[in-house]
Amino acid sequence: MIRTMLQGKLHRVKVTQADLHYEGSCAIDQDFLDAAGILENEAIDIWNVSNGKRFSTYAIAAERGSKIISVNGAAAHCASVGDIVIIASFVTMSDEEARTWHPNVAYFEGDNEMKRTAKAIPVQVA
């Protein structure tokens, strides 16, 4: 059996640019890509916490240390500057691999300040 698992996640980053006329994609600070293990040109899903929209695109690198999250092209209709989003990538693997898999998660606050990274998502309690 093949399973699709969360590979990397940028949790609650703030959109810094939305450029409708750029070629497409989402430009992401290279430091953020590294923290989540997301590669340039990799497919990503973006979930907009601010407006509930969910969409797919691909990642491109923004300048390291810039804190840029730029939603580009048609996707700019789905996010505005200041929106809080979650960016995720996924990987497929065998059932056996999936049982010991741990995603790369980076947590953000404020103006895209990375607060911590983790190799798991906390258990939700009642």
Curated annotation (Swiss-Prot):
Signal sequence range: none
Reactions that this protein is recorded to catalyse: L-aspartate + H(+) = beta-alanine + CO2
EC class name: lyase
Residues that span the membrane, as ranges: none
CC annotations in GO: cytosol
EC number(s) per entry: 4.1.1.11
Metabolic or biological pathway: Cofactor biosynthesis; (R)-pantothenate biosynthesis; beta-alanine from L-aspartate: step 1/1
Location of the active site: S25 (schiff-base intermediate with substrate), Y58 (proton donor)
Gene3D superfamilies: 2.40.40.20
UniProt entry keywords in alphabetical sequence: Autocatalytic cleavage, Cytoplasm, Decarboxylase, Lyase, Pantothenate biosynthesis, Pyruvate, Schiff base, Zymogen
Compartments it resides in: Cytoplasm
Cofactor section: pyruvate
Primary localization: cytoplasm
Amino acids binding substrate: T57, G73, A74, A75
One of the record's GO molecular function terms: aspartate 1-decarboxylase activity
Modification after translation, per record: Is synthesized initially as an inactive proenzyme, which is activated by self-cleavage at a specific serine bond to produce a beta-subunit with a hydroxyl group at its C-terminus and an alpha-subunit with a pyruvoyl group at its N-terminus.
Biological processes annotated in GO: alanine biosynthetic process; pantothenate biosynthetic process
Description of how the protein assembles with itself and partners: Heterooctamer of four alpha and four beta subunits.
Physiological role: Catalyzes the pyruvoyl-dependent decarboxylation of aspartate to produce beta-alanine.
Database matches in NCBIfam families: panD
Family that this chain belongs to: Belongs to the PanD family.
Protein name: Aspartate 1-decarboxylase
